[in-house]
């Protein structure tokens, strides 16, 4: 008799210096759902600890962290440096896999979606944009990586 497969749980993260959008997907369906956002902490360590709490509470097995790759090849942004540090801290605190995923234009796409579909004001869209962007990041990752489902 074969052992049942462990449930795979993913957390999508749209990292920002003010707010961090979050999305969730779990086996067997792997449908990405927005789960809100958290405010960034005063330090990277504080932010990573807030994320670690969510990761441990939800028993996440893999974090998909949006990586804002600049449009021009060879450039690196200060935000990318923070994301690399956050990635290392998450791995240190939680011992989970962290995948850096290209998030170019995900926030802009999320903003357009909310503006067109919901009729919300800019103020009302603020936090929702971040969690929708995290959902887009996680969905793109899951759709381009079908082997992770098995």
Curated annotation (Swiss-Prot):
Q: What is its EC number?
A: 3.1.-.-
Out of the domains of life, which is the source?
Bacteria
The record's section on SUPFAM superfamilies has: Ribonuclease H-like
What are the GO cellular component annotations?
Answer: cytosol
Class of enzymatic activity (EC top level): hydrolase
Molecular function (GO) terms for this protein are: nuclease activity
Query: Would the keyword Lyase turn up in this protein's UniProt record?
Result: no
Question: Could you tell me which InterPro entries the record lists for this protein?
Answer: RNaseH-like_sf, YqgF, YqgF/RNaseH-like_dom, YqgF/RNaseH-like_dom_sf
Coarse class of the protein's main subcellular location:
cytoplasm
One of the protein's GO biological processes = rRNA 5'-end processing
Query: What is its subcellular localisation?
Result: Cytoplasm
Q: Which UniProt keywords apply?
A: Cytoplasm, Hydrolase, Nuclease, Ribosome biogenesis
Give the protein family: Belongs to the YqgF nuclease family.
Q: Which HAMAP family match?
A: Nuclease_YqgF (MF_00651)
Its function, per the record, reads: Could be a nuclease involved in processing of the 5'-end of pre-16S rRNA.
- Under what name is this protein listed? Putative pre-16S rRNA nuclease
Q: Which organism is it from?
A: Chlamydia felis (strain Fe/C-56) (Chlamydophila felis)
Native organism taxonomy:
Bacteria, Pseudomonadati, Chlamydiota, Chlamydiia, Chlamydiales
């Amino acid at each position: 008799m074969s052992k049942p497969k462990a449930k795979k749980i993913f957390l999508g993260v749209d990292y920002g210096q003010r707010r961090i959008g979050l999305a969730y997907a779990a086996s067997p369906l792997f449908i990405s759902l927005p789960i809100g956002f958290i405010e960034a902490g005063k330090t990277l360590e504080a932010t990573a600890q807030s994320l670690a709490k969510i990761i441990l509470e939800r028993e996440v097995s893999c974090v998909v962290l949006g990586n804002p790759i600049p449009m021009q090849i060879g450039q690196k942004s200060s935000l990318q440096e923070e994301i690399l540090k956050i990635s290392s801290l998450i791995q240190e605190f939680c011992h989970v896999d962290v995948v850096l995923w290209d998030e170019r234009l995900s926030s802009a796409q999320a903003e357009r979606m909310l503006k067109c579909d919901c009729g919300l004001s800019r103020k009302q869209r603020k936090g929702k944009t971040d969690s929708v962007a995290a959902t887009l990041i996680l969905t793109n990752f899951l759709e381009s990586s079908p082997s992770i489902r098995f």
